[in-house]
């Protein structure tokens, strides 16, 4: 069973993990200020944010964790009824403050489609490596 990268518990991927790098809680004056220069509704800004804060920041994930997380995202994207906007609201027990205005994002599904496209592009070798393994042995 695949274990969490930092804890001795089973790893259960959650789409909110993709939002973790954008958590501005207690960092409003630094990270929050940096995010204020981007418009989350513009494709070019979204792509820059995803590359810098998810792709480049994903180094704490092993190739196996990346595969499981991307598979989970693919599953959600294949469900036409999945409400991606709910991921941007404060969930009980999930303490993440997203940048101002993100809860009003025009196309939350599009944001996650961009994440899927870019992670599959930039993590291609890791995802391929993991797909060649027997996941039941993890």
Description of each model-found segment:
Residues 1-3, 51-59, 95-102:
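Charged, low-complexity surface segments at secondary-structure and domain boundaries
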Residues 1-51, 116-120:
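Short terminal alpha-helical segments
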Residues 12, 25, 29-32, 61, ...:
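Surface-exposed, interaction-prone regions used to assemble/regulate multi-protein complexes
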Residues 16-19, 47-51, 55, 70, ...:
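Generic detector of well-ordered alpha-helical segments enriched in charged/polar residues
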Residues 28-81, 85:
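Amphipathic alpha-helical interaction modules
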């Amino acid at each position: 069973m695949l274990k969490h990268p930092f804890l001795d518990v089973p790893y259960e991927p959650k789409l909110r993990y993709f939002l973790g790098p954008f958590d501005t809680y207690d960092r409003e004056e630094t990270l929050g200020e940096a995010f204020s220069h981007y418009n989350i509704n513009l494709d070019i800004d979204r792509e820059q944010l995803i590359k810098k804060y998810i792709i480049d920041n994903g180094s704490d994930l092993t190739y196996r964790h990346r595969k499981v997380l991307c598979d989970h995202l693919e599953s959600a994207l294949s469900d036409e009824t999945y409400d991606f906007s709910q991921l941007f609201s404060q969930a009980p027990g999930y303490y993440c403050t997203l940048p101002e205005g993100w809860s009003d994002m025009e196309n939350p599904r599009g944001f996650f489609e961009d994440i899927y496209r870019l992670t599959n592009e930039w993590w291609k070798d890791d995802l391929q490596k993991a797909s060649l393994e027997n996941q039941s042995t993890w």
